[in-house]
Structures are given as C-alpha cells and as structure tokens.
A protein has these predicted regions:
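N-terminal active-site beta-alpha-beta segment that forms phosphate/nucleotide-binding
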Residues: 18, 30-162
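Surface-exposed, charge/polar-rich loops and edge strands
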Residues: 14-18, 30-35, 42-45, 49, ...
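Redox-cofactor binding/interface segments in oxidoreductases and associated redox assembly factors
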Residues: 80, 168-169
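Short glycine-rich anion-binding loops that position phosphate/pyrophosphate groups of nucleotides
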Residues: 84-86, 171-175
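Basic polycationic patches enriched in arginine
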Residues: 24-27
C-alpha cells in the first residue's frame, strides 16, 4: 500500500499513488521545480501554528489507524522524520508507534565518504522513545554524520529491507500522487531499496496539493 495522507481541517483523505512517480514531478502553472517549491513552502508557512498543529494531529490520527490495520506480525519497524519548519509533524504518530511496540527509526545523513562507500545519502537509525532528545541526527536532520560520529550501539542502523512502513516528507503533490521533494534526491535513492511489502506514506497538508 502506498498513499499520501492529506489533512484538511475536518477530514483526512488518503490518495493512492504510484511509487514510480516518486522523484518525478511535472511543471505546474508554468513554474520550474525551484519556483514551485518556493511557492508551495510559502503557502505552507502561511498556516498559523494552531492550524498547523491541528492538521498534524489529524494526519497522525490517520497514520495510527493505518498502524492498527497493519496486522499483528512482530517485530515491526517504521521510519519517520523530524519535522522542520512548517512540515507536517509525525511526532505524535512516532510516539504511538513506540507504544504499539514498533521499532521507530529516523533518517541520518551520511558523510560524503560514507555516501561514496554505500551509494546512499542517508540511512535510518532506530531511536528508543526516551533517547530522541539525545540523537544528534534528530536535532540536526540535514547535517551529515560520519559513521564514527553516531553511537551505533545506541542508535543502530535499520536496514531498508527491514522496514514495514516509512513516513516520507514532501513539498508538494498532485492528483496523480506524484511527489515533489526538496531536491536532494535522498528519498529517490532510498525508496527503491525498500521491501515491496513496505508501506510508503507521504504526509502533507492540502495546501501542498498542486493540480
């Protein structure tokens, strides 16, 4: 199952998308990708804090529903992200997943040397519920870390093929489910390495929809 969870003020609407569309987004309204990113981020930034919090809470509630419907198989692992700026915030979902006994992982950017060595720009590291404030890659999600900079015994890498669900950030999406990211290509490289059974879920507000 692959879907985008979209929040409106009073409802949640899941939209099926095609994984092959990730990383490919048609130009919208005569804009190039950079212009489109700026325009959509500005629209998202314009949401006041209370509205953004309400929308994020609604998104997380829908994610918890998906979590509950994923079956009793254990152990399970889910990757989320640490929200930056005005992004939809999956923190409440991450807490709920941990309470359900799921292993929760966060993106950790690789150093240039490690990127060359493994062919990926990021990995997912497991973080126990009480350790989130101590994880440097959560505090600084865009910073690159050498393997020796992170305590791998405390924050072990979760192999991509071991993930059962991944929650993906995005800038914009359209009615076909195509996703526009931030332009770094990290998820474009990472997502194809996941198990075919992994649920890939992009979360956004309806203000980020571009048709």
């Amino acid at each position: 199952m692959v879907c985008v969870v979209v929040s409106t003020f009073d409802q949640i609407k899941p939209t099926k998308i095609n994984l092959s569309l990730f990383g490919r987004f048609e130009r919208g309204a005569g804009m190039d990708k950079a212009e489109l990113r700026r325009a959509v981020i500005a629209r998202r930034d314009a949401l006041d804090l209370d509205m953004r919090a309400a929308k994020s809470a609604a998104v997380c509630a829908r994610l918890v529903e998906l979590l509950g419907g994923s079956g009793p198989v254990a152990p399970r692992a889910v990757a989320v992200y640490a929200a930056m700026g005005s992004e939809a915030d999956p923190a409440a979902f991450a807490a709920a997943a941990a309470k359900h006994g799921w292993r929760v992982a966060y993106p950790c950017m690789f150093s240039a040397a490690d990127t060359v060595a493994c062919g990926q720009r990021m990995c997912m590291r497991a973080v126990a519920a009480g350790d989130a404030s101590e994880a440097p890659f959560i505090a600084h999600p865009t910073r690159a870390f050498a393997a020796t900079d992170v305590d791998s015994s405390r924050f072990p890498i979760v192999p991509a093929e071991a993930l059962d669900m991944i929650v993906v950030p995005l800038v914009a999406f359209d009615h076909t489910g195509a996703r526009l990211g931030y332009g770094g290509g990290c998820y474009d490289r990472y997502l194809p390495t996941l198990s075919p059974a992994c649920q890939i879920i992009g979360i956004a507000f309806d203000e980020q929809r571009v048709d």
